[in-house]
Swiss-Prot record:
This is DNA ligase. The gene is ligA. Zn(2+) binds at C415, C418, C433, C438. The keyword Magnesium applies. Transmembrane segments: none annotated. DNA ligase that catalyzes the formation of phosphodiester linkages between 5'-phosphoryl and 3'-hydroxyl groups in double-stranded DNA using NAD as a coenzyme and as the energy source for the reaction. It is essential for DNA replication and repair of damaged DNA. Its cofactor is Mg(2+); Mn(2+). GO terms for biological process: DNA repair; DNA replication. It catalyses: NAD(+) + (deoxyribonucleotide)n-3'-hydroxyl + 5'-phospho-(deoxyribonucleotide)m = (deoxyribonucleotide)n+m + AMP + beta-nicotinamide D-nucleotide. Belongs to the NAD-dependent DNA ligase family. LigA subfamily.
Length: 673
């Protein structure tokens, strides 16, 4: 017990001691005192702060847990985008990336910093005046959710940094730490054992459990989950200020953050690959889940020179380990109906653990895939799951230990949801329900419209959408904008605050850009990327609606089938009426038209092989920005074939047809670079 008479000094001494021992226990994993001794100090500080409330500080160890349950999460813009990384799945792809880095940077020797890719939830922590003030989830990379109260309960998150430490590390401004919230394997297994004893459903995997724990509305529940936080990125006053990533990680450790010790710096890709393969061998021994290794250019000065692609930095890449697999039995084949009416066969599997997740379903894509596999109900199959990819059936096992099934699957002629006719258009692999009023199509179209990356309407999930459709409150996505408090309060488990939160979320969608609106319409074959290209090319939804198929073909990545799909969608009167109602609701129907150059206007290019400095996507974008068009196949209409290393059959065909073959340097000259 402290004998200091001054309560303020006594409280500060206790806080310093508790922070020190929390760091020893939760960050260094090297405690110096027993839990009982720690509890004595904690209780002494609680009593002192209760007696002298004016002494309570936001970064006190007593303030980790507590607070009333919240109604929802506030959305917060990131100080700088939290971008995803490009992936490499084999040695060749990693070497291609390294070669591009060397060419673009103009450096023959590059230092590569390697870190384990933890399988958790990305998080940004902000510190002002050395105190932890905000935690934001990654969200869509631009906007996340404020989960500060929950992250305060994670013991490896420092609530503050001492002035002495700041001075020692030359941290002169406010700073932001990015990292991964994970569920350590032992804690996860213990929690699932406890849930099983209580008759509760077990969590499928540590990543999902961590994400769920971060997003519960009661911080006390987060505290019970014993999560961990590993830091991997440091921003000071919104910018990178340390010369090397390896030094930034060292600084994070000095600031009191937990940083993964499985990291190293190498000067050759050969050594990087040795590190990658060694860590894959050690994977099962680690106290947490990983799904690969992140490789970064160590020099942060080169980060500026290398820059970014559309969604990822050029100075980093994630080497993803091969999918984990297991053998199990197909108990049945079910059919799901999607928002475009597509019928997708799904294998109902005997539950099997794969990479920390219990898998009981696997997509079979379409009837052609079932025929290719030669799959029968009752067969034993190999199932793979990699990262967030939906589990898939890779092959049928046919040996004496795994007898073949007997029952052949047949695609239904009537929709399992509405009984409508099912058709398969000539030249397509998919079967579709043609009933425009199919409730399954309606449900899926609304879920798509409300999903993250589209309109991002928080709270509009399966349960709410099912009620809205079943009660006839929503018959298309435009009806969402006619919902009011009275309609929402008529639904089960809906209170005033929840109803208001949903209405606020719906109102917020009116500020989202044109490409989100186009993507949200659910036009068949129009994904997020194509929607963005349409918005950039035409600059308004009216321009897209009025475009002919020929005009649509001028848009990047739009081929004949996509052009036909877009044209047919807007030719349908009910869809035009839907668009009219969405415009009346106040959604963004105008964007910024991206003007393209004319240097390569009217020229058609085909890319083949690996180019020295450009990735295929980068070369394609440069050509299209200059007014050219990139095709996937060589024909007499092709003007140039751009050939790199290991060019394939397209090069042979170009020579046969007499099409000009050029290399990357020649392409740069055509581009005026």
């Amino acid at each position: 017990m402290s004998r200091t008479k001054d309560p303020a000094k006594q409280a500060e001494d206790l806080r310093e001691k508790l922070r020190y021992h929390e760091h020893r226990y939760y960050v260094l994993d090297d405690p110096e005192i027993s839990d009982a001794d720690y509890d004595v100090m904690m209780n002494e500080l609680k009593a002192l702060e209760a007696k002298h409330p004016e002494l309570l500080t936001p970064d006190s160890p007593t303030q980790r847990v507590g607070g009333k349950p919240r109604e929802g999460f506030v959305k917060v813009a990131h100080s700088a985008p939290m971008l995803s990384l490009d992936n490499a799945y084999n040695e060749e792809e990693l070497r291609d990336w390294a070669r591009r880095v060397e060419e673009l940077s103009g450096k023959a020797e590059i230092e590569y910093e390697c870190e384990l890719k933890l399988d958790g939830l990305s998080m940004a922590l902000r510190y002002q005046d050395a105190r932890f003030v905000l935690a934001v989830t990654r969200g869509d990379g631009s906007i996340g959710e404020d989960v500060t109260l929950n992250l305060r309960t994670v013991k490896s998150v420092p609530l503050g940094v001492s002035s002495a430490t700041l001075k020692k590390t030359h941290m002169l401004g406010d700073f932001e730490v990015r990292g991964e919230v994970i569920f350590p394997t032992k804690s996860f297994e213990k929690m699932n054992e406890d849930r099983e004893k209580q008759g509760l459903a077990k969590f499928a995997n540590p990543r999902n459990a961590a994400a769920g724990a971060v997003r519960v509305l009661e911080p006390n529940i987060t505290a019970q989950r014993r999560l961990d936080f590993y830091a991997y990125f440091l921003l000071v006053d919104g910018r990178v200020h340390i010369d090397r990533q390896s030094e930034a990680l060292d600084t994070l450790e000095k600031l009191g953050f937990k940083v993964n010790s499985n990291r190293a710096v190498f000067k050759s890709i050969d050594d990087v690959l040795k590190f990658i393969h060694k860590k894959e061998e050690d994977r099962e021994k680690l106290p947490y889940e990983i799904d690969g290794v992140v490789i970064k250019v160590n020099s942060t000065a080169l980060w500026q020179r290398l820059g970014f692609t559309g969604k990822a930095p050029r100075w980093a890449i994630a080497y993803k380990y091969a999918a984990r697999a297991a053998v199990t039995q197909v108990e049945d084949i079910l059919v799901q109906v999607g928002r475009t009416g597509k019928l997708t066969p799904v294998a109902a599997l005997k539950p099997v653990p794969i990479g920390g997740t219990t898998v009981s379903r696997a997509t079979l894509h379409n009837m052609d895939e079932i025929d290719r596999l030669g799959l029968l109900i009752g067969d034993w199959v190999q199932v793979e799951r990699g990262g967030d990819v939906i589990p898939k059936v890779v092959k049928v096992i046919d040996d004496k230990d795994h007898p073949r099934g007997k029952k052949k699957f047949k695609m239904p002629e009537r929709c399992p949801e509405c009984g409508g006719h099912v058709v398969r258009t000539e030249g397509e692999a998919d079967h579709r329900c043609v009933n425009a009023n199919c409730p399954a199509k309606l449900r899926e179209s609304i879920l798509h419209f409300a999903s993250r990356g589209v309109m991002n309407i928080e709270g509009m999930g399966d349960s709410l959408v099912n009620q809205l459709v079943d009660r006839g409150l929503v018959k298309n996505v435009a009806d969402i904008y006619e919902l009011d408090e009275e309609k929402l309060l008529s639904l089960e488990r809906m209170g005033k605050k929840s109803a208001q939160n949903i209405l606020d979320e719906i109102k917020g969608t009116k500020k989202l850009p044109l490409e989100r609106v186009i993507y949200g319409l659910g036009i068949r074959m129009v994904g997020e990327r194509t929607a963005q290209f349409l918005a950039e090319h035409f600059g308004s939804l009216d321009g897209v609606m009025k475009a002919t198929e020929e005009e649509l073909l001028e848009v990047e990545e739009v081929g004949p089938r996509i052009a036909q799909s877009i044209h047919e969608f807007f030719a349908e009167p009910s869809n035009r009426e839907l668009v009219k109602r969405l415009e009346a609701a106040g959604l963004q129907f105008k964007g910024v038209k991206k003007e393209r150059g004319t240097a390569l206007a009217g020229q058609t290019f085909v890319l083949t092989g690996s180019l020295p400095t450009y990735s295929r996507d980068e070369a394609k974008k440069l050509i299209e920005d200059a007014g050219g068009k990139v095709s996937g196949s060589v024909s007499k209409k092709t003007n140039y074939v751009v050939a790199g290393e290991e060019a394939g059959s397209k090069l042979d065909k170009a020579r046969d047809l007499g099409v000009a073959v050029i290399d990357e340097d020649a392409l740069k000259k055509l581009l005026g670079k």
